[in-house]
């Protein structure tokens, strides 16, 4: 049995993670208004945003289907970082991040339209950043890659060169925790293999 799986996100990295493990999602980016969420608690922020994204898309769908919403931020030194506002912002952030340890938080909301049930979880991974030089920081920012990433780096891209160590879930840093997703699917009463597409990853 193949269950329709909907990803309420425009993130190419999240879609690729799912495709790598055999899940070919229907991608329906959410137009949830993130500005209405004002909490300064990083865990509450990512779970609230993930839920908002998933619910907007779920309300437009018919059962049976599973809808996944995700949101990620980097917490470092008590500050919350989403996507940078531009190259200079990325440079400024990396000057703060270099040589430091941050926490990458990803909120996951999985909605089962058939059972009218949803699960909300947060995965946290610690990331040690390398002590980059000013030239390395500017060169990386000017590639444009960090401008599209929560936390200002892409672990699965050039940014992977500037991460010294990860403690916790690797895929969580890229955009969603595959082990956590499997657990959530199981908790809803499904087998993750029910989501596999007929095509090879």
From Swiss-Prot:
Keywords from the named record: Cytoplasm, Hydrolase, Nucleotide metabolism
GO molecular function, one term: nucleoside triphosphate diphosphatase activity
Superkingdom: Bacteria
Keyword NAD appears in the UniProt entry: no
Alphabetical list of InterPro entries matching this protein: ITPase-like_fam, Maf-like
Main location: cytoplasm
Protein's UniProt keywords contain Heme: no
Top-level enzyme category: hydrolase
E.C. number(s) listed in UniProt: 3.6.1.9
GO terms classed as biological process: nucleotide metabolic process
Single GO cellular component term: cytoplasm
Catalytic activity line of the entry: a ribonucleoside 5'-triphosphate + H2O = a ribonucleoside 5'-phosphate + diphosphate + H(+); a 2'-deoxyribonucleoside 5'-triphosphate + H2O = a 2'-deoxyribonucleoside 5'-phosphate + diphosphate + H(+)
Pfam families membership: Maf
Transmembrane segments annotated in the record for this chain: none
Family annotation (NCBIfam families): maf
Protein family according to the UniProt entry: Belongs to the Maf family.
General function of this protein: Nucleoside triphosphate pyrophosphatase. May have a dual role in cell division arrest and in preventing the incorporation of modified nucleotides into cellular nucleic acids.
PANTHER family hit by this protein: BIFUNCTIONAL DTTP/UTP PYROPHOSPHATASE/METHYLTRANSFERASE PROTEIN-RELATED, BIFUNCTIONAL DTTP_UTP PYROPHOSPHATASE_METHYLTRANSFERASE PROTEIN-RELATED
HAMAP family to which the protein is assigned, alphabetical: Maf (MF_00528)
Name of the protein: Nucleoside triphosphate pyrophosphatase
Native organism: Acaryochloris marina (strain MBIC 11017)
Species lineage: Bacteria, Bacillati, Cyanobacteriota, Cyanophyceae, Acaryochloridales
């Amino acid at each position: 049995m193949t269950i329709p799986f909907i990803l309420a996100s425009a993130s190419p990295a999240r879609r690729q993670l799912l495709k790598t493990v055999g899940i070919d999602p229907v991608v329906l980016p959410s137009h949830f208004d993130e500005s209405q969420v004002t909490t300064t608690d990083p865990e509450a922020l990512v779970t609230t945003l993930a839920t908002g994204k998933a619910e907007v898309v779920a309300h437009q769908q018919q059962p049976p289907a599973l809808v996944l919403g995700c949101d990620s931020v980097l917490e470092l030194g008590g500050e919350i970082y989403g996507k940078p506002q531009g190259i200079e912002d990325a440079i400024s952030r990396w000057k703060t991040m270099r040589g430091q340890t941050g926490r990458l938080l990803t909120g996951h909301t999985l909605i089962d339209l058939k059972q009218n049930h949803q699960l909300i979880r947060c995965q946290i991974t610690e990331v040690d950043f390398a002590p980059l030089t000013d030239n390395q920081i500017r060169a990386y920012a000017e590639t444009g890659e960090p401008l599209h990433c929560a936390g200002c780096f892409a672990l699965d891209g050039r940014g992977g060169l500037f991460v010294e160590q990860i403690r916790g879930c690797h895929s969580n840093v890229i955009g969603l925790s595959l082990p956590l997703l499997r657990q959530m699917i199981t908790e809803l009463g499904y087998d993750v293999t029910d989501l596999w597409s007929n095509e090879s990853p």
